[in-house]
Structure formats: structure tokens, C-alpha cells
Amino acid sequence: MSTSLNVALVAEFDLCEKLAETLEQSCLEIEKLSVVELFPFSEEQGIRFNNKSVEQRPLDETEWSDFNYVFFAGDVTHAAHMAKAAQSGCVVIDLKGVCASLNDVPLIVPSINDEQLVVLQRNIVSLPDPQVTQFVFSVSQFARENTLSQVLVTSLLPASYIDSYTVNKLAGQTAQLLNGIPLDEEQQRLAFDVFPSPKSTASLAAQVEKIFPQLSNVIFHQVQVPVFYGMAQMVTLRSEYEFDAQAQLHAWQANELVDYREAS
């Protein structure tokens, strides 16, 4: 028996647009999709789903009980809205991991620890930071089958990891420099440059440990790089025993969420 869903997207415009595209391509039977404006959209910003315009609602005027699922991409300042939505009976997908540190909220990497979804105490499911998700996909089998003495992760972060404003800023700086126009000396240079990310890594390590308690010694290094989309990572694993690489290769090949390609 199929079930038609009412779904709300709560995010900035660019992310709402991407989420709507992804849901349209999914196998979910969505009867109605709505957008709750985390920040007010401009007049020309509209979302379409299945060739129809999507209803847009102000955040403070939303009746959360209208929805079955809410994809919420707010920060900690929006936590009260997230809690209200969960208390209204809908399942909240916490896309930015605001509730990831709460003991009674599962932190899920799809296909890796789905068993944590069996009991939902708060109607909230948190997703890890993208750095953590990508790292967990890359080492899941190693983590399950080996004792790792040290794990080092270097993440090369694109502009889109921060927000759409940073993407536009990188595009503007790139065009400016290619046209021979120097940047303002007081301006943080993004184009044709790399620099350490100021974001704290403590929460990243804590999220990894919540998913894999045996990985309590993960160290993240973050580098902001001049690319628009796509995050790369370099991972170093240390163990007193020899690794079985084939087990991890088989895990990648068997996972529909991993696009595994052998080096040519």
C-alpha cells in the first residue's frame, strides 16, 4: 500500500531548489511539496516541483502538523522551530546536524547505520556534516573490522560548503582577477588561493565517534580551496595490523550511494 506524503523544505533558496530536484527524481510519492522560507526569498526566486510552482510560507506562520516530513537546514538559532515541528508529529530531517550531539537523536549516514532509526524518541533524525558523511563512506568497513590507532583526514572544501554567497564571491573574484583587476587588500582572497578553514573540528570528531564509537582518535584538517562544488578528502589510517583492502572495495561496490570507479 503506497502512501502519499506532504513534505516541507526549510532552507535557503539554492538548497531548496536542489532538494526539490532530488525529490522529484526519487521514488517517493509526494502529494504536496511546500517551501518554508528560512530567510525571505526575493520576488524572482521560486521553486518548481513536477512542473508546478511550489507554495512558499513564512517560517513564523507555518503549521507544522500539515506535514509528514520536514527537511530542515537551519542553524542552532532555528532549533526552537525544529523542536516545534517535531512536537507537532512530523519527522524532521536535521540536514545540518544541529541536534547531532543529543543522545536521543540518531545521527545517520544512510546505509551505514540505518538500524539507529528503529526507535525515534524526538521525531528528529540528524545528518552529519558532509565531511563526516564522506569520510564514513570511505572507511566504514575498515572501521568495523580493524583496530585503528590513528586516523587523519584532510578535507579540501569548496565554496559551496560554506554557502551560496561564497560561491558567488568566488565567481566574482575569479572574473575580476582574470580581467587583470586586483582585489581589495582587505578582502579575503578566495580565487586562486588556499587557506585553512577557521571552522572548529571538534564537532566533526564527535560526530564520527557517535557513528563509530571505536573511532575516538580522528583528527580533521580543513583547507578552503578555490573550487565551486565537490569536496575531496585525503584519509590516512594507521593500525598495528595489516588491512584487508578487498573488504572495503567490496563495500564500496555494493553500496548504491557510492559511485566507485577503479583507476584506469
Predicted regions and their residues:
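N-terminal Rossmann-like NAD(P) cofactor-binding subdomain of oxidoreductases
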Residues: 1-188, 214-218
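Charged docking surfaces used in two-component/phosphorelay signaling
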Residues: 4-5, 70, 160-264
